[in-house]
Regions:
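Active-site-proximal, substrate-binding regions of enzyme catalytic domains
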Residues: 1-90, 97, 105, 154
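Acidic, PIN/NYN-like endoribonuclease modules and their adjacent C-terminal/linker elements
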Residues: 41-42, 100-162
Length: 162
């Protein structure tokens, strides 16, 4: 089971790889705040995201999300997924450093998109070569990734292919 945030959904939608989430997790959950954040007409990947949400359980935003957002200095959508993951003791898939830092203070285990790619390559969902191509595509489409992290992930993916 996984709770997904827009920071992971959007880049995966840009490169047509939302299926990596459903291939890795049996149950996918998020909040209305996140759904509304990503379903924006005229934006790249919106149609793919809309179809993806057919298989996602979308929960109401937790009552205390606004208070947590205010106290932690994060967006309400970010607080909503942290609280949802915390409540169900679930993994949070996100790609936002600030959100991940706050989530960890709440005891929530977090994966980044790069972690998902590594998991998919290890399990054979994609080959290591395909995962490297996806990594390149993500960065090429605008996903922020430090060059050092890119090099480390690319190296690990290459080792999986050996």
């Amino acid at each position: 089971m996984v709770v997904v945030d827009s920071s992971a959904l959007i880049p995966l939608a840009w490169v047509g790889r939302l299926g990596l989430i459903s291939a890795t997790f049996d149950e996918i959950r998020t909040t209305k705040e996140v759904r509304e954040e990503v379903l924006v007409e005229g934006k790249l990947g919106t149609a793919a995201l809309d179809a993806f949400f057919d298989a996602v359980t979308v929960h109401e935003t937790p009552d205390d999300a606004e208070q947590v957002a205010s106290m932690e200095g994060i967006a309400v959508a970010d607080a909503s997924v942290i609280l949802l993951a915390e409540d169900g003791e679930e993994l949070l898939l996100a790609n936002d450093r600030g959100l991940i830092e706050v989530a960890r203070t709440h005891g929530v285990e977090c994966w980044r998109v790069t972690t998902l790619l590594l998991k998919c390559a290890k399990e054979g969902t994609v080959t290591s070569e395909e995962a490297i191509d996806v990594l390149y595509d993500l960065v090429d489409e605008g996903m922020n990734l430090h060059p050092k992290v890119y090099a480390q992930v690319q190296k690990k993916l290459g080792e999986l292919g050996d």
